[in-house]
Each structure stands twice: as C-alpha cells, then as structure tokens.
Amino acid sequence: MNRESQDHKAFVKAKFDRIVRRYDLVNSLGSFYQDYFWRKRVARLFKGAEGPFLDLCSGPFTLSFEILKENSSQLFALDLSLEMLLYGKTKASPLQKYLFPLRGDAERLPFKDKTFGALSIAFGLRNLPDRVRALQEFYRVLKKEGLLVILEFSMPKSPLLRYPYLLYLKYGLSFLGGLLTGDKEAYLYLASSIQKFPPPEEIHRLLEKVGFKKVLLKSLTFGVVTLYAYQK
C-alpha cells in the first residue's frame, strides 16, 4: 500500500471515528429519510441468498440488521473504524446473535476464497483508494454465483437536478453534518468524494472486467444513489 492510500484511509477512519454517534441521524436527516428505503432495496436482494453474508464498510450495522431481517444467516460486518463497530454493538437487537463484527480493510479481506454467498457494501466503495483491488477481493471471497450488492452515491444526470444537488451537498449537508457532529470537514469530504466518484457506467465496466455479471443496475431517488447487483 502506498503512502497516499495509507494517508487517505487514516483520514477517513479518523472522520468516521469522530461522527459515529450521530452518523445514522445525519444520514437520515440529510437524505430526507430516503436512506431507509435504499437499505430496504438492498436487503430484499438477500432474501433468497445463500449464507454466510459479508457487509463491508458496515458502520454501526445499520444495513447489516436490515439484511438479517430478510435472511437471518450468519453475517460478518467489517469496518475500518473500531469505534463504529463498538457503537453498533450497543444497539439492542435480537439479530445481534447472527452478527460477527470485525475490524479490517475492505481491500485486503481476511477470509478464504469462496467463503460468502452474498456481499454488500453501502456508501463504502467511494472511500476505497484502489477500487480494482477491492472488487477483485470481493470476487475472490464470494462463492460461485455469489451475489455482490453495492449501494453508492452518484450524480443526477439532469442539469436541472445536478447543480442544486451539488449546492446542497456543499452547503446544506455540510452545515447539517457539522452542526450535529461537530465535524463539518467530514461532510465537505463527503461532497467532494461524491463528485469525484466515477459514473455508474464506469463502475459497471470495472465490475465486468473483474468477472462479475450484471443482475441489476438501477438509479434511485432521481439519480443521487445507484444500486448495483452483480453475480460471480
């Protein structure tokens, strides 16, 4: 891993460690409660999947629990931030018994080949410096015909929505996030990382190059989020 990648991951980890207690609240308020429906769309894809599952960049298990509501298989929740994982463990849920938290790097997964029947990553691919390596790792740990589900921010294609959305990210969301968490810089980074993230068409090409086959590629909420479902 080069120094630039190390520095980037250290920065992201520090920001997530700092905002952990208000992370879910800002996500819900900042998305006008659309995040609930986005997670539901992901979780439904796991309904008939074979376990065990892996939820990457899991944060405090917000998506993990939604997946387990649909399919109570063994689920490993991996995140770079120990603070996120510890906070997730404080959530009272009968589903905790199916969940196994693990601190780790999504670009270097500590699992054997062909371990998981399905893998999810919500709003985490954007934060990984080496996306090709990450996708290759996802492919490696999935079983044959295993399911990969990615939920990630994207930019609306329509200029009528694109520019107001950019203004909202830079000023509205950063103000809200800064007010509630005390770390405005974390949400300025969020706005910047969304702008820099490749469009869905480019991510699709990367997934196919690694060896995945498209099951579903869908724009949600006027294009501010994209849902990718691909099969090994």
What does each model-identified segment do?
Residues 32-50, 66:
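Conserved alpha-helix/loop element of class I SAM-dependent methyltransferases that forms part
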Residues 117-130:
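A short SAM/SAH-binding and catalytic strip from SAM-dependent methyltransferases
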Residues 54-108:
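Class I SAM-dependent methyltransferase SAM/SAH-binding core
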Residues 132-147:
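A short glycine-rich, Lys/Arg-flanked "PGG" loop and its adjoining helix->strand segment in the class I
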Residues 1-22, 169, 180:
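N-terminal, positively charged/glycine-rich alpha-helical extensions of SAM-dependent methyltransferases
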Residues 107-118:
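A short acidic, Gly/Pro-enriched loop at the edge of an enzyme's catalytic core
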Residues 154-206, 216:
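C-terminal alpha-helical "lid/dimerization" subdomain adjacent to the S-adenosyl-L-methionine
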Residues 211-232:
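Core SAM-dependent methyltransferase catalytic element
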